[in-house]
C-alpha cells in the first residue's frame, strides 16, 4: 500500500472477518482490495481491539487531532537511523515488496494487482531482482537443460 493509502485508511474499509482492506481512494482512481495476512492482520486486529473505533475513524489517527492522520516522519527517520540504512524512503518499501514478490514466484499480474499498478511496465520499474536470485534462476535453467 502507498503511504497515503495507509495514513488515510478508516476502519470502515477494514474487514477483519474476511481479512482484507478495501481501498476506495487510490492513486490510479480504482478501488482495490488488499488481503490482510500474517503479521499485518495480527497488528491491525490488536489495534482494533485496543482502540474500539467507530467506522469513520482513521486507523492511524494523529494523537493531537483524531480526524487527521498521524505523522510518521519522526518514527520513520528513527527506524532508518537505528537500522543504519541510508537513502531509503518510505516509498522504497513498494520497490522492496515488488522485488521480494518477484523473487518468490509471483507473476507480473499478481504483483501489479497487489501494488495497484495498471500497467506491467510499472511492475517492471518497481521489481528489482537480486544478483543472487538471477544466478539461482540461471543455475536452475542450466540443470534442466544440461542435466
Task: Mark where each language-model region is.
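C-terminal catalytic core of tyrosine-transesterase DNA break-rejoin enzymes
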Residues: 1-5, 75-80, 94-118, 125, ...
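Conserved tyrosine-mediated DNA breakage-rejoining catalytic core shared by Y-recombinases
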Residues: 1-49
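Phosphate-coordinating loops and pocket residues in cytosolic domains that bind phosphorylated ligands
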Residues: 8, 16, 125-128, 143
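Exposed loop/turn and edge beta-strand positions of beta-sandwich/beta-sheet ligand-binding modules
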Residues: 17, 30, 54, 70, ...
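Catalytic-site neighborhood detector that most strongly recognizes the C-terminal catalytic loop/helix
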Residues: 25-29, 41, 115-140
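C-terminal catalytic core of Y-nucleophile DNA break-rejoin enzymes
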Residues: 26-46, 56-78
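C-terminal secondary-structure termini that scaffold catalytic or DNA-interacting sites
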Residues: 46-50, 54, 62-66, 121, ...
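Residue-level marker of regulatory loop/turn positions in helix-turn-helix DNA-binding domains and
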Residues: 68, 90-91, 115
Amino acid at each position: 500500500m502507498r503511504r497515503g493509502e495507509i495514513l488515510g485508511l478508516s476502519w470502515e474499509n477494514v474487514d477483519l472477518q474476511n481479512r482484507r482492506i478495501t481501498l476506495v481512494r487510490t492513486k490510479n482512481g480504482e478501488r482495490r482490495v488488499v488481503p490482510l495476512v500474517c503479521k499485518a492482520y495480527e497488528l491491525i486486529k490488536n489495534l482494533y481491539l485496543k482502540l474500539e473505533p467507530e467506522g469513520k475513524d482513521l486507523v492511524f489517527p494523529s494523537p493531537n487531532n483524531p480526524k487527521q492522520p498521524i505523522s510518521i516522519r519522526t518514527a520513520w527517520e528513527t527506524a532508518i537511523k537505528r537500522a543504519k540504512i541510508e537513502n531509503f524512503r518510505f516509498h522504497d518499501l513498494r520497490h522492496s515488496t515488488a522485488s521480494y514478490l518477484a523473487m518468490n514466484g509471483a507473476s507480473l499480474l499478481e504483483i501489479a494487482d497487489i501494488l495497484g499498478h495498471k500497467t506491467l511496465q510499472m511492475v517492471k520499474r518497481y521489481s528489482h531482482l537480486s544478483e543472487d536470485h538471477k544466478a539461482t534462476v540461471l543455475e536452475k535453467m542450466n540443470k534442466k537443460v544440461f542435466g
